[in-house]
């Protein structure tokens, strides 16, 4: 664990100052202290010395509102292209829903190629890898077909869908898999006749319960959730209040490895920022505390030119069923209607690949050594006959081609 933390916290003050001064030339020790105190500049003492998170400097200009404005004045707003894609796509999805009243809409055919390349110089005989593979049990993800891969085992039994491969190690060892599938957008508007009753606590016990170490109804979680919800008693609107609040209050920032965090939702409350998975776990925890069934879903987002790992959630609303919620995409401020603004509360775009239906499960075949990522499963996992191979021992890459 110490090695993992050292890889994440590997910057000294002299390493991060050039980036900070690029956008904030007058920043001095007083500013640094203020940012550290507000947790906008993440650091940790290791062996008596202060080290900053490897992405602390870029994160500062995402977390601190003043710094964010200074950077935008120089570079422009982040991810403008993705916002344009999302706006056009949501408009198309809503138009199609209004015409058809189907919940699965605007399908795309995706061709996905994934690679893991092992570093040279390993002292081992065999490499075992688990690669991400699209789930077959999700209605909005269909027609899955393997296109190329040798000597593999496909696992659909676990909450983590994977393709397992092993081969003899040599320098430049690379594992590759290619598959295609159809992916749909999904949309569930609020029904006019929704009765706003609580879900069956016995039937959905698993999804309203605590699950250590990350889904714990601590006093902090209870107090924060209650302050967000206030006097609202309807489950749908309780969850929507949480959804609306989290993105406003906890800006997105690059995250340290989940395996180094004792309790992720508590970490978000303390640090006042989080990435997609951290915010989703906080959302799930808050919903479960209020007896709203909630569960994890994750994989990849496939927005053209913005492809990346991504996590989100689902909640169960009596009279609607399970509906998707993406807390990190949040309220769409450009929207002029409720449907546009709250699209990601009850809706999700078609640019997704679903790999995981929960977090922290077992891989198949079972991994012998500890996982590099013990919460999520997206980048893959690797091990030899004697030990786990952490992320610094290999590289992953992927290509996506979308066709409508």
Language model: regions and residue ranges:
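Acidic low-complexity segments
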Residues: 157-164, 169-270
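Sec-exported extracytoplasmic/periplasmic mature domains
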Residues: 25, 226-230, 244-252, 288, ...
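Low-complexity, Gly/Ser/Thr/Pro-rich intrinsically disordered linker/tail segments
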Residues: 348-404
């Amino acid at each position: 664990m110490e090695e993992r933390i050292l890889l994440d916290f590997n910057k000294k003050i002299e390493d991060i100052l050039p980036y900070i001064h690029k956008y904030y030339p007058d920043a001095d020790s007083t500013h640094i202290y203020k940012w550290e105190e507000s947790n906008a500049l993440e650091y940790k003492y290791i062996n008596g010395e202060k080290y900053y998170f490897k992405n602390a400097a870029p994160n500062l200009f995402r977390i601190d509102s003043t710094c964010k404005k200074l950077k935008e004045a120089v570079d422009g707003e982040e991810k403008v292209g993705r916002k344009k894609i999302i706006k056009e796509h949501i408009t198309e999805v809503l138009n199609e829903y209004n015409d058809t009243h189907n919940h699965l809409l605007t399908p795309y055919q995706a061709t996905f190629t994934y690679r893991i390349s092992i570093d040279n110089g390993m002292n081992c005989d065999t490499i075992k890898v688990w690669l991400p593979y699209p789930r077959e049990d999700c209605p909005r993800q269909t027609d899955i077909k393997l296109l190329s891969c040798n000597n593999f085992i496909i696992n659909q039994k676990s909450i983590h869908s994977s393709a397992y491969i092993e081969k003899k190690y040599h320098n430049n060892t690379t594992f590759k898999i290619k598959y295609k599938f159809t992916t749909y957008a999904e949309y569930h508007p609020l029904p006019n006749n929704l009765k706003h009753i609580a879900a069956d606590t016995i039937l959905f016990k698993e999804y309203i319960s605590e699950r250590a170490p990350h889904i714990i109804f601590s006093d902090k979680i209870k107090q924060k959730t209650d302050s967000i919800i206030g006097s609202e008693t309807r489950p749908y609107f309780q969850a929507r209040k949480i959804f609306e609040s989290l993105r406003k209050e906890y800006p997105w920032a690059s995250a340290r490895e989940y395996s180094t965090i004792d309790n992720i939702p508590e970490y978000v409350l303390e640090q006042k920022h989080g990435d997609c998975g951290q915010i989703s776990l906080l959302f799930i925890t808050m919903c479960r505390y209020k007896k709203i069934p909630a569960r994890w879903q994750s994989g990849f987002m496939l927005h053209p030119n913005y492809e990346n790992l991504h996590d989100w959630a689902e909640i169960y609303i009596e009279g609607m069923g399970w509906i998707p919620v993406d807390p990190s995409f949040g309220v769409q401020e450009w929207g002029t209607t409720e449907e546009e603004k709250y699209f990601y509360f009850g809706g999700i775009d078609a640019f997704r690949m679903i790999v995981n239906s929960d977090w922290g499960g077992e891989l198949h075949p079972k991994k012998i050594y500890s996982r590099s990522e013990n919460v999520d499963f997206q980048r893959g996992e690797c091990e030899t006959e004697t030990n786990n191979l952490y992320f610094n021992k290999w590289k992953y890459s992927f290509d996506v081609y979308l066709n409508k």
